[in-house]
Amino acid sequence: MFVFPASVLAQDSPDWLTKFPRREVHVSAWPGGKKVAVSFALFVEVFGFGQGPILRPDLASRNPDLVNESFRQYAISAGNPRLGRLFRELDVPLSVVLNAAFADAHPAVWKQFRDTQPKAPIIAHGINNSNDILPLGRGLTEQRAYIRRTLDLIAKSTGVRPTGWSSPSVYHNADTMQAIASEGLSYSLDQMDSDTISRLQTPSGVLTLLPYPTVTVDMGQFLARMKSPSEIESLWLDYVVELAREARANPVREATTVVIGLHPFVFGTPDGAASMRRVLSELKKDDTVWLTDTEAILKAAGVN
């Protein structure tokens, strides 16, 4: 008899954050018999002048802070299109996690990027990533209004109304999950504690939770742990290849999923893109790995 790992069994119980019922979605294999679904999700974000990620904390007190602002502007204007081109060139699906204010704030950049990725699923990511984020602690009604405004803005500026959600800075609460479901969204990237898909039964409907592991998010590794793109390249390959090895060692093991957070600040530079190219080229060689997008995962799992 095969015994599921404790981490899998733990999903068939109340969610530890929201206390809502949560159950694993059982997937024996992905299309083509593959066992590890990998979706790279590019975070296309807007911060505003003087706000956002800081590469050089020692210079952040300058006014204006030209060095760190240049770091951010380069990522937005050069990094996003470069990554769009790279994924198109290698014919690897890409998912897009979008701040609602981005397309209007940077219309030329958005057009240039979207021309390279016209069919990439768009996942809503709040209004911006600095001063217009989720109103946590202010009740369900205000969160619903914020999420609705986010969806309306994205639909107006891109022509696409998202069905997925990612909370800015992965900062949310139980009201967020209920509000997401209330506004007609079907899935979230806010699950950071598993290798398998699960379903969250909120009072307003069911949400599918796609695994978005903390350790694989490039921004945290880059800014908090001071890892270079080539070091993150090694981490990503180790992470996915080990999941594939586990699957080959135990063929009856549940198929796994990992959505990997990708930011233009880290991998949108020429050296970062070179690392990204090596990651994708290596993963394409593994017949256990399915490189795909978030919506294809939902469809294959039968939950879209």
Regions found by a protein language model. Give the residues of each.
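Boundary at the C-terminal end of the N-terminal hydrophobic targeting segment
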Residues: 8-10
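Active-site-adjacent pocket scaffolds in enzyme catalytic domains
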Residues: 12-32, 152-156, 160-253
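Active-site beta->alpha N-cap acidic-glycine motif
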Residues: 12-121, 129, 256, 279-283, ...
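C-terminal domain-boundary segment and adjacent tail
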Residues: 21-25, 117, 187, 192-193, ...
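Metal-dependent polysaccharide deacetylase catalytic core of the NodB/CE4 family, i.e.
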Residues: 62-64, 81, 89-173, 197, ...
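Non-membrane alpha-helical structural segments and their capping/turn regions in soluble enzymes
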Residues: 77, 140-148, 226-237, 270-273, ...
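Conserved strand-to-helix beginnings and helix N-cap segments that scaffold or border functional pockets
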Residues: 106-107, 174-177, 270-276
